[in-house]
């Protein structure tokens, strides 16, 4: 680049960072205005302005091939290919799973705001990516012997969330995309049915392999699709893995690169699986200090020290996912349960801490955090 071009690019980045900073600060102001008497409702709303800002972040990344972090096992020299050749539908946004949930986010925003300013561009990108040809290549990739554990279970879960979003949309173009995606979604469902009966122990990490999260979105998909086999599997595995859990060591959280709370993501699964009488009993045994906001390490937002570091910025995602878990767990407890208020207040603190940093100006967080923010702001507590 010439000197003048470099200066122009720097000025553009500064202007973009300033505008996104102002936008996300407005989210903080909305959070501060939230009245505690409405604590069971979403503390922040997703309006058209917010939707546009989130959409622009995803649109910027979904067609961006590099930098790219492939989860690709080479069986030979012929397998060394560019990301767009390996994954013609989901090559952007740094990695496969972020691309998948970036597509989900755009669909969610398009369904909520069909006349969004970015709607035309959203449809153009989705139509270019979610073709039958592209998704056939994606499905064939899953058929490789070396790809058996590919994106298990985090990417699987988001793929089913994408399929669920498409399947529930009465839109002519959306129906074509849903049809194109169905063979890949069917493969992922089979992967769940084949793998989880063999996994004897849950993975309780705060990152991608987390078992509870993988089962959570699979449960949502299965219920929406009327898939009784997958529903039964998730319910049986959830009870097997987590049904007897008590006195969870939540004071050990967070891990330094977590974007899930192993404690809360497990409870968010169990409130789906257990009935309204059973879940409060399980939760009281599982996290007995919740009514007092204890342990404090779980109820206070995590601190992020460097948003240019792809591992440390995970903690912004942790604050967002903690917020959606706490809201939904609280909604699953009886009104008189003393843990509700502590969970709702902490959810607001976590949301406020994270939303201002979804657009940090660095791709380390910007390629994925907006999806977490949209899920938090658009998913109704208790769903």
Locate predicted features.
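Low-complexity, Ser/Thr/Pro/Gly-enriched N-terminal "stalk/linker" regions
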Residues: 41-91
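Well-ordered alpha-helical scaffold segments within catalytic/enzyme domains
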Residues: 41-46, 56-60, 100-116, 157-173, ...
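Bacterial N-terminal signal peptides
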Residues: 19-32
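N-terminal secretory signal peptides that target proteins for export/translocation
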Residues: 1-16
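Solvent-exposed loop and edge beta-strand segments that line ligand/cofactor-binding
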Residues: 42-48, 83-100, 140-157, 198-211, ...
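Long, repeat-rich segments with strong aromatic
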Residues: 225-362
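Acidic, carboxylate-rich catalytic segments that either coordinate divalent cations
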Residues: 346, 353, 357-383
